Regions:
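Residues in well-ordered beta-strands of folded domains
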Residues: 27, 63, 183, 205, ...
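Short Gly/Ser/Thr- and Asp/Glu-enriched loop/turn motifs at secondary-structure junctions
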Residues: 55-59, 97-100, 240-244, 295-299
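Short, glycine-/Ser/Thr-/acidic-enriched flexible segments
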Residues: 252-254, 307-309, 353
């Protein structure tokens, strides 16, 4: 089976026969395991490099300023790779360059030609840099994507090298300042700083497709309560309070002979909160505004916004909406117990017990690193 046979993002059931014929082993999404292994990789990188930006769950940028003075960069990249492999048993690609955009391309090459490169590519050499840029399609450049690449192709810009040689004035005129920065980065001019601390989130969204179509209000309400509780937990992790809360529901837009229905509702609290009880209560009120019987719902979710760094807002003279007494201490206990004894140790009754609406993960691999019950047993 070759990659051209597969369609990215297509549902499993549509490609199940293809997988079976090719002997492909499939697993359900194991978010808990992914997050824990990601944390171990990032912790390892932070021990090796003085400055690290965690870009995503499986990607990070390391500042190697000054390393060249005492180490060969390719050797240092191999050391990073070997250390991560030793501690986590995960193979990573290492791309080294003067800018983030070039480092992403170097990483792309390290993964694509792993046998030839040993999983490490250093683009410090300008000639090597240009050779790689000449064979990389422009759509593979970080931040370009399909829509912009089509317009670039129409202008005769086919490769990353072609893009790097364009006038920044023309690129800015026909596109935007973001693509202009990409051109400069491809030339080795740093335009994107390393962000050691993630910027404060402007919103938090918690949503998931149901394991099967849901028709009962109670099941959707349980899902909304669970997403609201998770959103509140994330909010406290960001040391933020929110005032804006919304909930949404939708049916599948692809269902045959079924009318599509999707809707959302929101409300703004007078006093900012990070209390799960307030957020759950508001989210359920939003659900009640948009709930319609007779639909087979595919997905639901909540969004939190209008953040404050502390639970204080300007009240009117006759307002009587003080924060709950003991709220912060109670939420601290809730989060501490769930962190210590496992998620879901303490939960709100509104979240339900059996949760039949949960996403089906029938091929879930064990969560070896976070659950004692999933540890391997030696007989």
């Amino acid at each position: 089976m070759c990659s051209s046979d597969l369609t990215m993002g297509a549902p499993y059931f549509k490609q199940k026969d293809l997988f079976r014929r090719a002997g492909v082993v499939c697993f359900s999404s194991n978010y808990e395991l992914y997050a824990d292994m990601s944390s171990r990789v990032m912790t390892t990188l932070e021990e090796i490099s003085p400055r690290v930006e965690i870009y995503s769950i499986d990607e990070a940028f390391c500042d190697l300023t000054g390393v060249r003075n005492c180490r060969n960069l390719t050797d240092f990249g191999k050391e990073i790779r070997e250390t991560v492999l030793k501690r986590t048993h995960l193979r990573v690609g290492v791309g080294i360059a003067q800018t983030k955009t070039l480092a992403k391309l170097a990483n792309h090459a390290a993964k694509k030609w792993q046998q030839q490169t040993g999983g490490v590519v250093d683009l410090s050499n300008i000639d090597r840099q240009r050779r790689l840029l000449a064979i990389v399609p422009v759509e593979d450049v970080w931040g370009v994507g399909r829509r912009i690449s089509k317009k670039l192709n129409a202008m005769g810009i086919k490769t990353a090298l072609d893009l790097s040689e364009q006038s920044t004035w023309i690129i800015r005129k026909h596109f935007n300042v973001v693509l202009e920065r990409t051109v400069r980065e491809l030339r080795g001019e740093p335009c994107l700083d390393l962000e050691e601390f993630a910027p404060t989130k402007q919103e938090i969204v918690c949503s998931r497709s149901f394991g099967e179509r849901v028709t009962e209000y109670e099941q959707v309400r349980q899902a909304i309560c669970s997403y609201a509780a998770r959103g509140a937990e994330k909010l406290r992790g960001e040391h933020q309070y929110c005032r804006f809360i919304s909930a949404f529901v939708k049916t599948s837009p692809f269902a045959l002979n079924e009318p599509y229905y999707g809707n959302s509702a929101s409300m703004t609290l007078l006093t900012p909160t990070q209390d799960s009880r307030d957020i759950i209560n508001a989210a359920v009120k939003c659900l009640d505004k948009i709930w319609k019987e007779g639909h087979r719902y595919q997905k639901a979710g909540i969004m939190l916004g209008d953040f404050f760094s502390q639970g204080v807002a300007q009240l009117n003279l006759f307002d009587n909406s003080a924060p709950r007494a003991g709220s912060e201490k109670l939420m601290e206990v809730l989060d501490r117990l769930n962190a210590k004894d496992g998620k879901g140790t303490l939960y709100f009754a509104g979240q339900g017990i059996q949760q039949q609406w949960q996403m089906k993960r029938e091929m879930l691999s064990p969560r070896y690193t976070t659950r004692y019950s999933d540890l391997l047993r030696i007989r």
